[in-house]
């Protein structure tokens, strides 16, 4: 099995599991569908993923884990090992759940820091998988999941296949509109895109800092004049 077929199989397996979790709950979670309820939804789904694999052992997925509760800086929402003997593949994969409120049609969620990805690759791994879902609030303020335009409730996408419009923002975090389609590329091609986007981000930050630096003399000259006025006022009052 070639690289792309294996990646498609991984996505199909994970999509199937999360879809089964939604079906079990009739596509409704007892969570208040606030604008920022994504983290609570993620916790619910992470637990559901681990529980599902534990109760329904999978021929290719093993050692499922969810993120430690309360750990805001955890590098993944859930993770698992995936083995496919025919391809000689057996590796750790990180999962990141992105549940977005339907009213936010142009949502551009943060998709992880560059340094997190670099460390993951340097540790001998590669695949970060996003699980995209959309939801809305029910009349009794619960969370109801919605089907995407293609009728599916769950979209899985590897970071490596992210749309080329992705940018790395000043935080820095990968960022792209969730409705941009995925674009298949090889692992090597992703590394080239990653390098280009990270360099562009750093260059933008340098340009901003250089502009601030260039403006520093005039700003402090202005403050010095203000301070002289202030000192004169204080001395005059006394």
Q: For the regions a protein language model found, what residue spans apply to each?
A:
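Nucleic-acid endonuclease domains
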Residues: 1-74, 80-93, 99-238
């Amino acid at each position: 099995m070639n690289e792309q077929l294996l990646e498609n199989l991984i996505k199909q397996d994970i999509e199937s599991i999360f879809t089964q979790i939604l079906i079990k709950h009739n596509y409704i979670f007892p969570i208040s569908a606030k604008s920022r309820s994504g983290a609570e939804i993620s916790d619910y789904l992470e637990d559901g993923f681990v529980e599902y694999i534990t109760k329904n052992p999978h021929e290719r997925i093993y050692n499922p884990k969810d993120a430690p509760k309360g750990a805001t800086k955890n590098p993944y929402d859930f993770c698992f090992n995936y083995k496919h003997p025919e391809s000689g593949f057996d590796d750790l994969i990180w999962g990141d759940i992105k549940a977005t409120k339907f009213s936010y049609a142009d949502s551009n969620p943060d998709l992880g820091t560059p340094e997190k990805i670099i460390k993951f690759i340097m540790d001998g791994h590669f695949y970060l998988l996003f699980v995209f879902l959309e939801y809305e609030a029910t009349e009794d303020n619960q969370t109801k999941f919605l089907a995407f335009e293609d009728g599916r409730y769950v979209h899985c996408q590897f970071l490596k296949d992210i749309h080329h419009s992705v940018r790395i923002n000043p935080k820095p975090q990968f960022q792209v509109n969730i409705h941009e389609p995925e674009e298949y590329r090889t692992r090597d091609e992703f590394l080239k895109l990653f390098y280009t986007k990270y360099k562009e981000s750093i260059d933008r930050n340098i340009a901003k800092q250089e502009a601030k630096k260039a403006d520093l003399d005039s700003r402090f000259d202005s403050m010095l004049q203000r301070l002289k006025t202030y000192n004169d006022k204080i001395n005059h009052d006394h």
